[in-house]
Swiss-Prot record:
Its EC number is 1.13.11.54, 1.13.11.53. It catalyses: 1,2-dihydroxy-5-(methylsulfanyl)pent-1-en-3-one + O2 = 3-(methylsulfanyl)propanoate + CO + formate + 2 H(+); 1,2-dihydroxy-5-(methylsulfanyl)pent-1-en-3-one + O2 = 4-methylsulfanyl-2-oxobutanoate + formate + 2 H(+). This is Acireductone dioxygenase. Keywords: Amino-acid biosynthesis, Dioxygenase, Iron, Metal-binding, Methionine biosynthesis, Nickel, Oxidoreductase. InterPro entries: ARD (IPR004313), ARD_bac (IPR023956), RmlC-like_jellyroll (IPR014710), RmlC_Cupin_sf (IPR011051). Its cofactor is Fe(2+); Ni(2+). GO terms for molecular function: acireductone dioxygenase (Ni2+-requiring) activity; acireductone dioxygenase [iron(II)-requiring] activity; iron ion binding; nickel cation binding. It comes from Gluconobacter oxydans (strain 621H). Catalyzes 2 different reactions between oxygen and the acireductone 1,2-dihydroxy-3-keto-5-methylthiopentene (DHK-MTPene) depending upon the metal bound in the active site. Fe-containing acireductone dioxygenase (Fe-ARD) produces formate and 2-keto-4-methylthiobutyrate (KMTB), the alpha-ketoacid precursor of methionine in the methionine recycle pathway. Ni-containing acireductone dioxygenase (Ni-ARD) produces methylthiopropionate, carbon monoxide and formate, and does not lie on the methionine recycle pathway. Binds 1 Fe(2+) cation per monomer. Binds 1 nickel ion per monomer. Fe(2+) binds at residues 97, 99, 103, 141.
C-alpha cells in the first residue's frame, strides 16, 4: 500500500502526517510540484518480462507523459538481489542528492521510498506497484528500496545520459527511519 509520512527535518521520531490514500498523497505533494498518480495497464507484465514488453504495456501512459514533460527517453530498471554492486548502488541511492532534471519513476513491480527534504520537512513517499512519482529537478531526496529489493520501474528522462546525481553532503538520510519494511521489500 502506498503511504506518505511527513516529519520535521529535525525530529525523525515525530510524525506530522501519515496518509495512505492516493488522492491524499497527491494533494499533499502537489504544492511542492511533485506529481503522484496511479496507473493501471490492461496487463501487468511479469517481474522478469523483457524490457520491451514492459514498455509496450505502458506505452499509452508513457507517450502522454513524455509529451507533457518533453522527455526524450524511457527505460526499465530492475533492482534485486542479482543487481551487480547492489550494496554500493544502495549506498548511492541512500545519500541525499538532487538532479538537474525531474526524476520520474513508475513502479511496475515491488516498492521503494522516495524521501524528499523540502523546507524543513521530510516527506517519505512509499511507492508501490502502479504508482507514478515525479520529483522536480533540484529537490533534495534519497531513495530506499530496502535491504532486499525486488523492484521493476520505468524511468523517464529528458537528458538521454540517464541518472546523474549531485550529492548534497548532508547526512540527513542516516537520521530517518527506513520506510520499506524488511519483510515487504520484495513485495508489492
Amino acid at each position: 500500500m502506498s503511504r506518505l509520512t511527513v516529519y520535521r527535518d529535525d525530529a525523525p521520531d515525530t510524525i506530522l502526517l501519515d496518509v495512505t490514500t492516493p488522492g491524499e498523497i497527491a494533494e499533499t505533494l502537489r504544492p511542492h510540484n511533485i506529481r503522484f498518480d496511479r496507473w493501471s495497464a490492461p496487463i501487468t507484465p511479469a517481474p522478469d518480462a523483457p524490457a520491451e514488453e514492459v514498455l509496450d504495456a505502458y506505452r499509452p501512459y508513457l507517450d502522454t507523459l513524455m509529451g507533457e514533460t518533453g522527455a526524450g527517453s524511457a527505460d526499465v530498471v530492475r533492482i534485486n538481489a542479482s543487481t551487480p554492486n547492489l550494496p554500493e548502488l544502495r549506498k548511492k541511492f541512500l545519500s541525499e542528492h538532487t538532479h538537474s532534471e525531474d526524476e520520474v519513476r513508475f513502479f511496475v513491480h515491488g516498492q521503494g521510498a522516495f524521501v524528499l527534504h523540502i523546507r524543513g520537512r521530510v516527506y517519505s513517499v512509499l511507492c508501490t506497484q502502479g504508482d507514478l512519482i515525479s520529483v522536480p529537478a533540484g529537490i533534495p531526496h534519497w531513495f530506499d528500496a530496502g535491504p532486499s529489493p525486488d523492484v521493476v520501474a520505468l524511468r523517464v528522462f529528458t537528458d538521454t545520459t540517464g541518472w546523474i546525481a549531485q550529492y548534497t553532503g548532508d547526512d540527513i538520510a542516516n537520521r530517518f527511519p527506513a520506510e520499506v519494511p524488511v519483510e515487504a521489500s520484495g513485495n508489492s
